[in-house]
Amino acid sequence: LENMGLKSFANKRIETFSGGMKRRINLLAAVLHQPKILFLDEPTVGVDVQSKTKIIEFLHHLNSTGTTIVYTSHHLREAQDFCTEIAILDQGKIKAIGSPKNLLESYPNTKNLEDIFIQLTGKNLRDVT
């Protein structure tokens, strides 16, 4: 609870928590049994900045202690900063895979993963459904 900034809420009822606080509690519940692999589907979507920061810090800590994290996100800049390996998918198919550094080196006319996505798919991120 302390790592997620929730220690002072230990004796509070969960229905009084904000959405971001509930997201952090759910993440803590997911790691209670110390899984070797953790699957997360957009864990920072729709949360406040404080919760997002706490979640990312916690995930970095988990990863540094040996937990493999499979992390889905539509926020490619967040993925670029957080992930060591990235697969760019479009319509269920892998379009590119590698470390952020290797992907950026493989597509020299791009500045970030969003540019690579657009180059590979011909779609702007907002056009993707």
Residue positions per predicted region:
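Helical segment within the ABC ATPase nucleotide-binding domain
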Residues: 53-65
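ABC ATPase "signature
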Residues: 97-98
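Conserved ABC ATPase "signature" region
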Residues: 1-9
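Conserved ABC ATPase signature
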Residues: 13-17
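A short, surface-exposed alpha-helical micro-motif characterized by mixed small hydrophobic
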Residues: 79-81
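Catalytic Walker B motif of ABC-type/P-loop ATPase nucleotide-binding domains
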Residues: 38-41
